[in-house]
UniProtKB/Swiss-Prot annotation:
Chief location: membrane
Transmembrane segments: 29-49, 66-86
Membrane topology: Multi-pass membrane protein
One Pfam family linked to the record: MscL
Cellular component, GO annotation: plasma membrane
Family annotation (PANTHER family): LARGE-CONDUCTANCE MECHANOSENSITIVE CHANNEL, MECHANOSENSITIVE CHANNEL MSCL
Full protein name: Large-conductance mechanosensitive channel
GO MF terms held by the record: mechanosensitive monoatomic ion channel activity
Subunit field text: Homopentamer.
Coiled-coil ranges from the UniProt annotation: none
Localization (cell): Cell membrane
Length: 122
């Protein structure tokens, strides 16, 4: 098998395409969360502490712990959103898996009943 053909099969697999879409959406979502934290949440926190520019004003001798705190808030929001999204997806997929199993069990029961009836008739 040629290298190009192998790469084509690899790149067209569903998992690779799903990963590519996830990376693009994740990058866009990261920008939204960064804006939410920088433009909405941190100014509110800054007002509580008496300053509206929390990230740049909270520094000590070049150590910008305000920016670090802002990054932690970014991370917590992203992690929470991803957790809720994955939880929702798992709930949806579990329901469909249960339905598939129930359908398979019903189909197997029908087939076994037919086989039993055929064996009885012999």
């Amino acid at each position: 098998m040629s290298l190009l053909k192998e790469f084509k099969e690899f790149a067209v697999k569903g998992n690779v395409l799903d990963l590519a879409v996830a990376v693009v959406i994740g990058a866009a979502f990261g920008k939204i969360v960064s804006s939410l934290v920088a433009d909405v949440i941190m100014p509110i926190i800054g007002l509580i502490f008496g300053n509206t520019d929390f990230a740049s004003s909270w520094a000590y001798k070049g150590i910008k712990y305000g920016v670090f705190i802002q990054s932690i808030v970014d991370f917590l929001i992203v992690a929470g959103a991803i957790f809720l999204f994955i939880k929702l997806i798992n709930k949806i997929t579990r329901k469909s898996e249960v339905e598939e199993v129930e359908e398979a069990v019903e189909e197997n029961t029908v087939l076994l009943t037919e086989i039993r009836d055929l064996l009885r008739s012999k």
